[in-house]
Amino acid sequence: TVVFYGDKNNWFAAWGAWVFNRYGVQDVRLLDGGRVKWEKDGRPLTTAVPTFKQGNFAVKKIDRSIRATLIADVLPAAKAAVKGKADVKLIDIRSADEYNGKVFAAAGFQELAIRAGHIPGAINVPWGSNVNADGTFKSVADLKKLYADKGVDGTQNIITYCRIGERSSLTWFVLSEILGYNVKNYDGSWTEYGNSVGVPIVNNAGTIWGAA
């Protein structure tokens, strides 16, 4: 068993869990609520760094079914959405301002893409919507309703993305590991898509270009 935990509602911990799943590690879990919940519950902390014997894990098979790529998955979905024929649910989990193109990155982070906006056909369900105020995951019923209200009920193929794939890993974890939906995480995310030449982009704020 491998348990990941971290800050910011486990967003980077979820990315680690997604990577481990991709490379075939068995029984990968997230600590519900992460470090913040652990501290609030008064659980013990230490500064000691543990040591372990060297393991012998070897990657036997890469799970390509949980990773979306630009050419094979994302661009076809975007072009289909432009034509009104989308059969894949794209979920942009960034903030509403990032999604609409009002800002190029979340506060405190440098955007690496030259354009702002979102992928055509993508709906916006910010990653923080998956958790309660204490950072723990919402109930299965609440999560199903959250996504059903956006037209996602598990009957479609789903692709999640954010800026670099870490926040979207949390949504991937929720949809895949908690709800059991068929979902891929696009780890290239907006950093790759927003820098790609000739791809369709939706920008609701009129601020498409971040650099000349």
Region spans (language model):
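Thiolate-centered catalytic microenvironments shared by cysteine-dependent enzyme domains
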Residues: 1-85, 102-103, 117, 167-189
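Short, well-ordered beta-to-alpha junction loops that form the rim of enzyme active sites
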Residues: 7, 92-95, 163
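Structural signal for conserved beta-strand scaffold positions within catalytic alpha/beta enzyme cores
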Residues: 30, 47, 92, 124-126, ...
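A polyampholytic, Gly/Pro-enriched intrinsically disordered region
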Residues: 45-57, 142-147, 203-212
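Extended, charge-rich low-complexity interaction segments
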Residues: 60-68, 148-149, 155-158
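Positively charged, proline/Ser/Thr-rich regional signature most characteristic
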Residues: 78-154, 195, 206
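C-terminal soluble interaction/assembly domains
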Residues: 145, 155-206
